[in-house]
């Protein structure tokens, strides 16, 4: 099990996962929101699941802090081909603990001019992360399938609708 990241915490991939790390995946997962319905005249009420739209992105920066490229649901691959987005999931749900969106990074193919990768998560539906069940993002060693780091958006995201991880 990897590091459970706290808000504002940074890690070095080389230090945490070792030099053998060649491919990583940023996974984003979340559940559908439970909404209570009142019914008609107090009858027929109950709960239903409501879709929630989260989105993962990756920003590539050079040593000077200049934005070099972006990968997100409208640009599924970096120009160099080293980073690929799985596509947009507009509803959430699915198997508990599974990734709804994935960004795969082939570290060996990332250009030397790229010094920093920043992952962002935002809520397109406007829900705060605290109101989205089981929301998380994680960094996975693609070879072993083990988490390198994990961030619990439902707990750490509080009232925010966007985070940079």
Q: Across the structure, where does each feature detected by a protein language model lie?
A:
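Intrinsic-disorder/low-complexity signal
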Residues: 1-165
């Amino acid at each position: 099990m990897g590091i459970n990241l706290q808000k504002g915490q940074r890690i070095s991939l080389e230090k945490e996962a070792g030099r053998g790390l060649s491919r990583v995946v940023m996974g984003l997962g979340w559940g559908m929101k439970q909404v209570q319905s009142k019914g008609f005249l107090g009858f027929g009420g109950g709960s239903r699941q409501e879709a929630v739209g989260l989105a993962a992105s990756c920003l590539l920066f050079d040593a000077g802090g200049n934005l070099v490229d972006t990968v997100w649901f409208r640009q599924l691959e970096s120009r160099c081909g080293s980073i690929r987005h799985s596509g947009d999931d507009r509803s959430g749900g699915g198997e508990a603990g599974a990734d709804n969106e994935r960004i795969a990074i082939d570290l060996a193919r990332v250009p030397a001019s790229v010094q920093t990768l920043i992952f962002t998560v935002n809520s397109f539906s406007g829900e705060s992360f605290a109101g989205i069940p089981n929301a998380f993002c994680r960094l996975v060693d693609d070879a072993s399938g083990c988490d390198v780091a994990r961030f619990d958006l439902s707990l750490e995201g509080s009232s925010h609708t966007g985070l940079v991880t």
